[in-house]
Amino acid sequence: MTKKILIINGPNLNLLGEREESKYGKTTLEEVKKNCESHAKLIDVEIKFHQSNIEGEIVTMIQKSKGNFDGIIINAAGYTHTSVAILDALLAIKLPTIEIHITNIYNREEFRKNSLISKAANGIICGFGVKGYIMALDSMKEIIS
């Protein structure tokens, strides 16, 4: 049976390709989605790709993933540093989780160096640009196989 991975993107990631190109690059979120879909076919997994600017919607996505997905890849963006609700949802569903960030959160502003959600993650991929999504897919495939 084909494994299913949920990819969740948090606030402002819908603006990829438009905002702070020096940090986030020129690739749009739609291009990231297409790249993930292509790579998912190559490694024989199914993905569902979501983006929301609303914390509660992200929590609901996570809660609904139990029984429907084998793992979660999450770029919680700004909620990484603030959302106990997202952390609690990830801990509650007990699915393998990979936290991802386009930039290296550890060489940015001090407040970005603290990830609340990492406590629920099997691993963290950060600082590799949008290529990190492909790295996360490969890593998740290994975890859930």
Where are these regions (language model features)?
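Short glycine-rich anion-binding loops that position phosphate/pyrophosphate groups of nucleotides
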Residues: 11-13, 77-80, 103-105
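Short, acidic/small-residue loops that bind anionic groups at enzyme active sites
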Residues: 91-107
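Glycine- and acidic-residue-enriched helix-capping/strand-helix junction motifs
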Residues: 16-30
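Extreme N-terminal starter segment of soluble prokaryotic enzymes
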Residues: 1-5
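Short, glycine-/small-residue-rich phosphate/pyrophosphate-handling segment
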Residues: 49, 107-145
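Short beta->alpha junction loops
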Residues: 46-56
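Short Gly/Thr/Asp-enriched flexible loops that form oxyanion-binding sites at enzyme active sites
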Residues: 64, 83-93
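Short acidic/histidine-rich motifs immediately flanking catalytic phosphotransfer sites
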Residues: 65-72
